Amino acid sequence: MIYSTTESIPGKEIEEIVGVVTGNVVQAKHIGRDIMAGLKSIVGGEIRGYTEMLTDARDIAIQRLVANAEEKGADAVVGIRFTTSAIMDGSSEIMVFGTAVKLKK
């Protein structure tokens, strides 16, 4: 499955727009990471535990987007965008969305 933030795939022609597809995940903070984050916020620097958590969450959201596109018979997803939001205290959602398309063979 090809997926891209661009509206087209170089060297490929879009034959049909299948529709909007999404993938999301809600990730909760880990108490150990939260303690380290509190310390890092005092001294500064990257909070690696959160970086890793968000990277994993983004990857899961992309996998779900691809699965959604495959269920609809798409060959690619174009124009993908990411959004984040706080769901409740201590958890965040990462959502990825885009347009599923069929490519000319």
From Swiss-Prot:
InterPro entries: UPF0145_dom_sf, UPF0145_YbjQ-like
Signal peptide: none
Top-rank taxon: Bacteria
Coiled coil location: none
Family note: Belongs to the UPF0145 family.
HAMAP family: UPF0145
Protein's UniProt name: UPF0145 protein CPS_2458
Lineage, broadest ranks: Bacteria, Pseudomonadati, Pseudomonadota, Gammaproteobacteria, Alteromonadales
